[in-house]
Regions:
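Transmembrane alpha-helix interface motif
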Residues: 2-46, 159-295
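Short coil/turn helix-boundary motifs
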Residues: 9, 49-50, 131
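Alpha-helical transmembrane segments and their membrane-interface exit regions
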Residues: 39-50, 63-68
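Juxtamembrane/interface alpha-helical elements of multi-pass membrane proteins
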Residues: 56-172, 286-295
Length: 295
């Protein structure tokens, strides 16, 4: 059973989902929309990392906490004053705005992580390699850079620990070790990029149109999923232009309950789009359990 959801779907369908989700979460400051997208993106990452360490999920949450705590010290708008700091009002509205801004950024980070796990380089080349070969190569290298950088950092740090270079006590020696480690990582990144570029140039990449070595057949399920994505997201953007998702944090925050009561069906559209992979995962889990029970 595939835990990466869209791996069994056509690459165009999976890419369309992530593009639409990014457009939805970044197109409005509506707290309900942001919360739905955040829950969906976190659920995606949790299920993708089912058997792996989940420490990577904490970093975006730290960013949410930082934005929540720091925004009131820079933005003093709002009518509900909690207290004064250096004769500046710290307002509840600024606190809430910082929290949902952090959720928006965290959702974007989780979606990019889920996209990287669901759409591999082969699928990315299949979609865009024929028309934009050079840009596709650059984007693929960018997507691979951070995971490779982290992997090489762990390997290099482990070697230094074996050589007991991390046992220095003075601050000067620790700083020298950190600079040396960063220099090695930077040199490796440049060398790796040059080797990749030279290798692709030697193979004639980008000179003529290239075909993909893997074929991805289009199925009826792909058509149904794409129509559902386009239909629900199209209805969302149409409602967005009419102001149905407008929300004001200042001078006073509006009631979330009132938002849902007035435009509840519009938020159902977001739930359908956001949780399509989760529903697909549950469906596959049920089918897998039934098949196992028949063995």
């Amino acid at each position: 059973m595939n835990r990466y959801f869209f791996k069994s779907s056509h690459p165009f369908v999976s890419s369309s989902y992530y593009v639409l989700m990014l457009l939805i979460v970044m197109s409005t400051t509506n707290p309900i929309v942001i919360s739905i997208c955040f829950l969906a993106s976190v659920s995606l990452r949790l299920l993708q990392m089912a058997n792996n360490k989940k420490s990577g999920l904490l970093y975006p949450m730290v960013l949410v906490l930082l934005l929540t705590l720091t925004n009131p010290f820079f933005v003093h708008r709002g009518g509900t004053i909690l207290f004064f700091f250096l004769n500046k009002p710290i307002t509840q509205e600024a606190l809430i705005y910082g929290f949902f801004s952090g959720l928006m950024i965290a959702s974007v980070i989780y979606l990019f992580q889920a996209f990287q796990a669901s759409v591999d380089s082969e699928q990315f080349f299949y979609l865009f390699g024929k028309r934009l070969p050079k840009l596709t190569l650059i984007l693929t290298m960018i997507f691979r850079f951070i995971p490779l950088f982290q992997q090489y950092y762990r390997e290099l740090n482990q070697v230094q620990k074996t050589l007991q270079r991390t046992q220095q006590r003075s601050f000067k020696e620790k700083a020298a070790y950190g600079l040396d480690l960063f220099g090695n990582l930077f040199s490796w990144a440049l060398e790796n990029a040059m080797d990749t570029a030279d290798s692709m140039k030697a193979r004639g990449y980008g000179v003529t149109k290239r075909s993909s070595r893997i074929s991805y057949p289009w199925r009826i399920q792909d058509t149904a999923a794409l129509l559902l994505l386009i239909g629900c997201s199209g209805a969302f953007f149409r409602a967005l232009t009419k102001g149905y998702y407008q929300y004001n944090f200042y001078p006073y925050t509006e009631s979330f309950t009132l938002l849902w009561q007035n435009h509840g069906w519009n938020y159902v559209l977001i739930i359908i789009v956001a949780f399509i992979p989760i529903v697909k995962r549950i469906k596959e889990g049920i089918i897998w359990a039934i098949l196992k029970s028949r063995i």
